[in-house]
Amino acid sequence: MAESVTIARPYAEALFRTAKESGNLAKWSEQVSLLGQVAANPDVSSAIGDPNVAAPQLVDLFRSACGTAVDAELSNFIQLLSNNDRLGLLPEIAGLYETYKRAEEGTKQADIVSAFPIDDNQVKALIPQLEAVFKTKLEAAVSVDPTLIGGIKVIVGDQMLDASVRGKLDAMATALNN
């Protein structure tokens, strides 16, 4: 994993610089994310790793999977990655691109894990409170984990705020056992 991120970094940096020069980081973000999702698809991933599938076939596969959602510049990027046998790095490239984009915008990703599904209005109400706690602008990524029993757990970078019932029970168990 660490090696693939190291190899993916120059591609992601070049892609980010190009997107920044075009002045449309958000549009490129959507397209790069789509490419990463396509590459992470198990069928596509196995095709990428199959030595019997030629580079032009892989490029055609990506172009047909993405359709018109990917513009000509990113289509050329797919061609470049294919020629260098790097299509399998697209999920890492997409992740690094998002990291660079957030750094440019001064935001961080808040991974919000809830015991129960929460709607967009609840997330919108929660974000300003979390921004005050973490002292940074946040973008939310929400997931559900019923094992939390109740409450939420928020992870921003290397910081975690655990306001879940499971977290409280674990803390009590630790206190009682020590």
UniProtKB/Swiss-Prot annotation:
Compartments, as annotated in UniProt: Cell inner membrane
Keyword Flavoprotein (UniProt): no
The entry's keywords: ATP synthesis, Cell inner membrane, Cell membrane, CF(1), Hydrogen ion transport, Ion transport, Membrane, Transport
Pfam families: OSCP
Gene: atpH
Gene Ontology MF: a single term: proton-transporting ATP synthase activity, rotational mechanism
Record lineage: Bacteria, Pseudomonadati, Pseudomonadota, Betaproteobacteria, Rhodocyclales
Physiological role: F(1)F(0) ATP synthase produces ATP from ADP in the presence of a proton or sodium gradient. F-type ATPases consist of two structural domains, F(1) containing the extramembraneous catalytic core and F(0) containing the membrane proton channel, linked together by a central stalk and a peripheral stalk. During catalysis, ATP synthesis in the catalytic domain of F(1) is coupled via a rotary mechanism of the central stalk subunits to proton translocation.
Protein name: ATP synthase subunit delta
Mode of membrane association: Peripheral membrane protein
